[in-house]
Swiss-Prot record:
Subcellular location per the Swiss-Prot or TrEMBL entry: Secreted
Source organism: Streptomyces violaceus
Pfam family, one: SSI
Signal peptide stretch: 1-28
The protein's name: Subtilisin inhibitor
Stated family: Belongs to the protease inhibitor I16 (SSI) family.
Site (Reactive bond) residue list: 104-105
Superkingdom: Bacteria
Designated gene of the protein: vsi
Quaternary state and interactors: Homodimer.
Matches recorded under HAMAP family: SSI
GO cellular component: extracellular region
């Protein structure tokens, strides 16, 4: 019994020493830069509701543009190119389409973008009267149509 207690005590002491030694080593390492690019990682959502906080999210995608396009966005490369053209100003992607015929039904749809664009925090939303006005306002652009 005494031998067992001594063996368990010695094993616990050895484990503590190993953990202390590796923890000290991990803290001493300097963080390495992963990229020379400013981060451009976004979460884009479309939801039913008057504002982003209360909208029931129907679709959501991720979009990463630097160093190369990626994420779950179905057209990541085209979306990144479109955002680069407007310098990440999402409001410039929304316009009025004069040839669209939409009902006056009030069933609000909110599009939101949260994340970082070229290293700057982004928190943008736009609310449309219904799905038809959203599609008309977003047009054929790739960034906000997913």
């Amino acid at each position: 019994m005494r031998r067992t207690l001594k063996a368990v005590g010695a094993a616990a002491a050895a484990a503590t020493c190993v953990l202390a030694a590796t923890a000290g080593t991990a803290q001493a390492e300097a963080p390495k830069a992963e990229s020379l690019y400013a981060p451009s990682a976004l979460v884009l959502t479309v939801g039913q509701g008057e504002n982003a906080e209360s909208a029931a999210v129907e679709r959501a995608v991720t979009l990463t543009c630097a160093p190369r396009p990626g994420g779950t966005h179905p057209s990541a490369a085209a979306a990144c190119a479109e955002l680069a053209k407007v310098n990440g100003q999402f409001a410039r992607l929304v316009g009025a389409s004069s040839d669209a015929i939409c009902t006056k039904e009030w069933r609000p749809v909110t599009v939101s973008v949260v994340g970082a664009w070229n290293g700057k925090h982004v928190n943008w939303t736009s609310t449309f009267a219904n799905q038809c006005t959203m599609k008309a306002g977003l047009g054929e652009g790739a960034a906000l149509t997913f």
